[in-house]
Amino acid sequence: MSNHAEASVAPVEAYEPPYYVAVFTAVRTQDQSGYSETNARMEVLVKDVPGFLGMDHAQSPGGLSITVGYFRDADALTEWRCNAEHRAAQKRGQEEWYQSYTLHVAKVERSHGFTRAQAAQSPTAG
């Protein structure tokens, strides 16, 4: 049995609402030339946007990728959407890297999280 506690994978924290999320779901094409480099650049660039809170990313074995960006307010989200390098990456994505994608933007009104304690959990004899 694998021990998931050893992995460095964790969701972003539950931020204080309200805040905004941009949920990007995509299926990529076979040709991914330049994708990794551009994606890495976007991950660095978005961190410079005032109001950027964090990002989660997951990919299914079937090829669906999901990226969730968290932003403090609509202005931060707009700044990212209008960034010239980001716009160029979006254009290239439509031309080369994505078979299909969907973007959902929402205002988060409620948020909470859970983290299991690091101490071993064992049932109490009873």
PLM regions and their residue ranges:
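Short S/T/G/P-rich N-terminal loop/turn motif that feeds into the first structured element of a domain
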Residues: 1-64, 75-82, 98-126
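Conserved RNP beta-strands of RNA recognition motif
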Residues: 67-73
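Amphipathic alpha-helical interface segments used for dimerization/assembly
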Residues: 81, 89-90
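Short, conserved catalytic or adaptor-binding loops enriched in Gly and charged residues
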Residues: 93-96
